[in-house]
């Protein structure tokens, strides 16, 4: 019975200890790394937007031909 209670309290203790150790190891990116990540994310957003816009431009005339302009 005591082993079950110890195990029950040991799991959150280990979780807290591992979590706090992980947070201590994490470091903020420097300015150069932050700018490179931001550029990559912005490029991805722009490319995905352009792809969606091009697909929409192609889809509208095809839809009008197939549906008959309804």
UniProtKB/Swiss-Prot annotation:
Keyword Transmembrane helix: yes
Record topological domains on the Extracellular side: 63-70
Coiled coil: none
Pfam families to which the protein is assigned, alphabetical: SecE
Membrane topology of the entry: Single-pass membrane protein
Positions in the Cytoplasmic compartment: 1-33
Xref: InterPro entries: Prot_translocase_SecE_dom_sf, Translocase_Sec61-g, Translocase_SecE/Sec61-g
Any GO CC annotation of this UniProt entry: endoplasmic reticulum
Tree of life domain: Eukaryota
Entry's transmembrane regions: 34-62
GO MF term list: protein transmembrane transporter activity
Localisation per UniProt entry: Endoplasmic reticulum membrane
Keyword Kinase found: no
GO biological process: post-translational protein targeting to membrane, translocation; protein insertion into ER membrane; SRP-dependent cotranslational protein targeting to membrane, translocation
The entry's keywords: Endoplasmic reticulum, Membrane, Protein transport, Translocation, Transmembrane, Transmembrane helix, Transport
Summary of the function given for this chain in its UniProt record: Necessary for protein translocation in the endoplasmic reticulum.
PANTHER family: SEC61 GAMMA SUBUNIT (PTHR12309)
Family under the similarity heading: Belongs to the SecE/SEC61-gamma family.
Quaternary structure and partners: Heterotrimeric complex composed of SEC61-alpha, SEC61-beta and SEC61-gamma.
Identification of the protein by name: Probable protein transport protein Sec61 subunit gamma
Species the sequence originates in: Schizosaccharomyces pombe (strain 972 / ATCC 24843) (Fission yeast)
Gene name linked to the record: sss1
């Amino acid at each position: 019975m005591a082993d079950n209670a110890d195990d029950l309290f040991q799991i959150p203790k280990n979780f807290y200890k591992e979590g706090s150790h992980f947070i201590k190891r994490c470091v903020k990116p420097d300015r150069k790394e932050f700018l490179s990540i931001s550029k990559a994310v912005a490029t991805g957003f722009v490319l995905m937007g352009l792809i969606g816009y091009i697909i929409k431009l192609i889809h509208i005339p095809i839809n009008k031909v197939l549906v008959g302009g309804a």
